[in-house]
Each structure stands twice: as structure tokens, then as C-alpha cells.
């Protein structure tokens, strides 16, 4: 960016911030019926229906550290969406899996993205291009710590 681009509206970071905040706000309205935050939503989507995974692997998928994930997973467990079980061979290794209730909401949760997308006046091709651009940006600049 040029040096003269010092106004807030011209800052790339501000555009990311506003986009993220406003999109999450839209998701939040749909997530209320499931008593989920946006972070809880992405964590549930990141866990496969028949999958058991540890916190480190899950954290790498969603770009969250264990300090953020641990309290979130406790809340999701209280709500009946996930189980947290310790490995018999290594009690430090906590395995996360979806419960039946967690599996049952996977489909309705996956439909939320479509509902949010429909709120924007955006062509499908435009959305695909934006997603690919953002995916390339994330892949290039942010490493998942697996």
C-alpha cells in the first residue's frame, strides 16, 4: 500500500476487521437457536461426524490455541454437543468427539453459511473468487500449528 493510504478506511486490516465483525454478527443471529457462539460453531464444524481428535489437531484446524479451546470445549460438553475423554495410555491426551446431539446439528449448522450468503447481494462467481483469494491469503501467510 502507498504511504498516503493512512486513513482508516484505506487500511487493509480495517477492511478485514469490519468484514469479519459484520459477518460474525450475521452468523450469531442464526446461532442463537443452538445456543452457540461463532467460535463454538466453527469448532463443531471442524469435527468430523465419526471423528475423534485431540485438542492440538482441532486447534490447528480452527487456528485456536488450547487456552482458548479448553474452556470452549467445556461449554460445548455441558451443552451436550461434544465429549472430552482422556486416553487410557496417556491421560494428558484429551480426545474430542461429537455426541449424538452434536452430530444431529451438523446439517442445520452447515446450512447457516448459505443463509448468511443469501443476505449479501453477491453473485456466486464473485463469492467463489473472494473465497479463493482469502483461502490463498490464509495459506500463504498463516501456518496451522499441527
Swiss-Prot record:
Signal peptide start-end: none
SUPFAM superfamilies per record: Winged helix' DNA-binding domain
Entry's Gene Ontology cellular component terms: cytoplasm
UniProt keywords, alphabetically: Cytoplasm, DNA-binding, Transcription, Transcription regulation
Molecular functions (GO terms): DNA binding; DNA-binding transcription factor activity
UniProt keyword annotation of Hydrolase present: no
UniProt DNA-binding region: 55-78
Record keyword Ribosomal protein present: no
All residue ranges annotated as the HTH marR-type domain in the record: 9-139
Entry's localization field: Cytoplasm
Major subcellular location class: cytoplasm
Family label: Belongs to the SarZ family.
Protein name, per record: HTH-type transcriptional regulator SarZ
Origin organism lineage: Bacteria, Bacillati, Bacillota, Bacilli, Bacillales
Amino acid at each position: 500500500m502507498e504511504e498516503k493510504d493512512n486513513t482508516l478506511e484505506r487500511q487493509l486490516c480495517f477492511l478485514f476487521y469490519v468484514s469479519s465483525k459484520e459477518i460474525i454478527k450475521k452468523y450469531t443471529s442464526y446461532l442463537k437457536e443452538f445456543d452457540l457462539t461463532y467460535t463454538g460453531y466453527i469448532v463443531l464444524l471442524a469435527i468430523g461426524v465419526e471423528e475423534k481428535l485431540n485438542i492440538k489437531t482441532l486447534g490447528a484446524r480452527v487456528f485456536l490455541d488450547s487456552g482458548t479451546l479448553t474452556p470452549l470445549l467445556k461449554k460445548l460438553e455441558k451443552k451436550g454437543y461434544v465429549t472430552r475423554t482422556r486416553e487410557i495410555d496417556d491421560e494428558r491426551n484429551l480426545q474430542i468427539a461429537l455426541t449424538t446431539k452434536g452430530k444431529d446439528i451438523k446439517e442445520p449448522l452447515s446450512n447457516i453459511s448459505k443463509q448468511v450468503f443469501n443476505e449479501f447481494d453477491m453473485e456466486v462467481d464473485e463469492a467463489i473468487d473472494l473465497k479463493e483469494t482469502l483461502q490463498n491469503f490464509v495459506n500463504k501467510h498463516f501456518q496451522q500449528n499441527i
